[in-house]
Amino acid sequence: MMKLKEFFINIISIFRSVYMVGMQAFSKRETYMYPDVACKLSSRYRGRIVLTRDSAGHERCVACNLCAVSCPVGCISLKKSENSEGRWYPEFFRINFSRCIFCGMCEEACPTAAIQLISDFEMSDYKRSDLVYEKSDLLISGPGKYKNYDFYQISGVKYSNKYKKESSFEEKPISVKTILP
């Protein structure tokens, strides 16, 4: 009697398994075939780093080195140089994407909005040396996310013919010698 009961339980179990496999075989897929179907990324997705230009077409980067200091893995290196007008620019700007963790700290630290993270994530390569991007690889032709922001219009730049004038609401600086007893 026990053997007959086990036999029917095993038969029912087999049919149930075949039914479940058949239902899953013809149902909608949960996974997407990646190269054929593009992934939908969030608007705040942090992908590859790019260097942007201002509205005049100049590089926004002033080589302040804040991005390299704020990078937790130290994948950014640059060297500051100065042109004839007194404007700073990076002589070289290098990012090692094999070390980059795409945290966005460099983008937050950049005062000129020169560094921006875009939604490009397809960066795999066979050689690590090909993942070291130079300034020419990183520079894009447009302003990126912040189209109207111009660092030099806000902060100024040292030009020989530019002078600083006092504002009407600004108080005169206090002289330390006059307040001493």
Swiss-Prot record:
| A cellular component annotation (GO) from this entry | plasma membrane
Which amino acids does the record list as binding [4Fe-4S] cluster 2? C71, C100, C103, C106
Q: Give the catalytic activity.
A: a quinone + NADH + 5 H(+)(in) = a quinol + NAD(+) + 4 H(+)(out)
Localized where? Answer: Cell inner membrane
**GO MF annotations in UniProt:** 4 iron, 4 sulfur cluster binding; iron ion binding; NADH:ubiquinone reductase (non-electrogenic) activity; quinone binding
Q: Alphabetically list the UniProt keywords.
A: 4Fe-4S, Cell inner membrane, Cell membrane, Iron, Iron-sulfur, Membrane, Metal-binding, NAD, Quinone, Repeat, Translocase, Ubiquinone
Residues the entry annotates as binding [4Fe-4S] cluster 1: C61, C64, C67, C110
Cofactor binding remark: Binds 2 [4Fe-4S] clusters per subunit.
**Which EC main class describes this enzyme?**
translocase
What membrane topology does the UniProt entry give?
Answer: Peripheral membrane protein
Cofactor(s) required for function per UniProt: [4Fe-4S] cluster
What GO biological process, any one, is recorded here?
Answer: aerobic respiration
The enzyme's E.C. designation: 7.1.1.-
**What positions does the domain 4Fe-4S ferredoxin-type occupy?**
52-81, 91-120
Which SUPFAM superfamilies does the record match to this protein? 4Fe-4S ferredoxins
Q: InterPro entries this protein is in?
A: 4Fe4S_Fe-S-bd, 4Fe4S_Fe_S_CS, NADH_quinone_OxRdtase_chainI
Which family is annotated? Belongs to the complex I 23 kDa subunit family.
Role this protein plays: NDH-1 shuttles electrons from NADH, via FMN and iron-sulfur (Fe-S) centers, to quinones in the respiratory chain. The immediate electron acceptor for the enzyme in this species is believed to be ubiquinone. Couples the redox reaction to proton translocation (for every two electrons transferred, four hydrogen ions are translocated across the cytoplasmic membrane), and thus conserves the redox energy in a proton gradient.
- Indicate the quaternary assembly: NDH-1 is composed of 13 different subunits. Subunits NuoA, H, J, K, L, M, N constitute the membrane sector of the complex.
Name it. NADH-quinone oxidoreductase subunit I
In the UniProt record, the gene name given for this protein reads nuoI
